[in-house]
Design a protein with these regions (language model features):
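Alpha-helical transmembrane signal-anchor/signal-peptide segments
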Residues: 26-44
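A short, solvent-exposed beta-edge/loop patch
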Residues: 4-21, 25, 113-209
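Short, solvent-exposed recognition patches
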Residues: 48-166
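General structural signal for secondary-structure boundaries
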Residues: 13, 34, 53-56
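Generic detector of short, well-ordered, non-transmembrane alpha-helical segments enriched
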Residues: 40-44, 106, 172
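Hydrophobic/aromatic-rich, well-ordered segments within soluble, folded domains that form packed cores
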Residues: 41-42, 48-50, 178-180
C-alpha cells in the first residue's frame, strides 16, 4: 500500500503523464501552417514538368500525407524527378526516404554512399546526397525542413525534439527529393541541374504568402 506522504507526488506524476494524452486526443493535435507543396511551380529553372503517374494513394500509404506531389521535370533531354511531401510523421520522411520515393520506379536504383553537403550558392541548405553504386549513374538529393529550420542530422533532430513532440502540437516536416537518373560520374554537386531545381523548389515553397 502506498504511503499517504507519496500521494501528492504520485498525483503530480500522473497529471504530467496525462498531458500528452489530453493534447493529442482532445485538443488540436496538429499545427496548421501556411505552407503547401502546391506552391512549388510546375516550371522550375527552365524545366517543364508533368505528373509522374504515381498512385494517388502513394503519399497516404507511405507517409500518412495528403499534401504531396511527384513530377518529372524535363529540359533538353535531361530529366529530374521531384517529389515533395509534408507529413506529421517526421520519421517517415527522414528515415531512408529513398526506400519509398526511389525504389520501385523506373528511376529506381541502388544507392551507395550518403553524405551531407553545403553549396556556396545556398550554404544554409544541408543537402543530403545519395551517391550511386559503382557502374550506376542515378543520384538523389534531398532536403528536410521542419518548423522553420533545415534538418541536417535526423538523429539529433529526434533527440532534441522528443520531449517537445510529447507536450505540444505536432508540426509537419517537409521532404524535397530530387532524383536524377543520368548524373555524370563524380559530379560537383553544386553544378548539378538537380541541385538548382531543388533550390528553386524550396525557395518557391518558403516564399512569403
Amino acid at each position: 500500500m502506498t504511503s499517504a506522504r507519496y500521494v501528492p507526488a504520485v498525483c503530480v506524476l500522473v497529471a504530467i503523464a496525462l498531458v500528452p494524452t489530453l493534447i493529442h486526443s482532445y485538443g488540436e493535435s496538429e499545427y496548421i501552417d501556411a505552407y503547401r507543396t502546391d506552391a512549388i511551380p510546375t516550371v522550375l529553372t527552365g524545366y517543364e514538368s508533368v505528373p509522374s503517374g504515381r498512385s494517388r494513394n502513394f503519399g497516404l500509404e507511405h507517409f500518412d500525407s495528403k499534401d504531396w506531389f511527384e513530377r518529372n521535370y524535363t529540359k533538353a533531354g535531361d530529366e529530374v524527378r521531384l517529389t515533395s511531401v509534408r507529413s506529421y510523421d517526421p520519421k517517415s520522411l527522414y528515415h531512408h526516404p529513398e526506400l519509398a520515393v526511389a525504389y520501385g520506379t523506373r528511376f529506381g536504383a541502388t544507392f551507395g554512399r550518403h553524405e551531407v553537403v553545403h553549396v556556396s550558392a545556398a550554404p544554409e541548405l544541408p543537402i543530403h546526397v545519395l551517391h550511386p553504386t559503382q557502374g550506376a549513374r542515378a543520384m538523389a538529393l534531398y532536403v528536410l525542413h521542419y518548423d522553420g529550420e533545415f534538418v541536417e542530422d535526423p538523429v539529433w533532430f529526434q533527440v532534441r525534439n522528443a520531449a517537445t513532440l510529447l507536450f505540444s502540437q505536432r508540426k509537419p516536416m517537409t521532404l524535397f527529393f530530387a532524383h536524377d537518373l543520368a548524373a555524370p560520374p563524380d559530379p560537383k554537386i553544386e553544378d548539378l541541374p538537380a541541385t538548382a531545381l531543388l533550390r528553386a523548389a524550396i525557395d518557391s515553397f518558403l516564399a512569403p504568402r
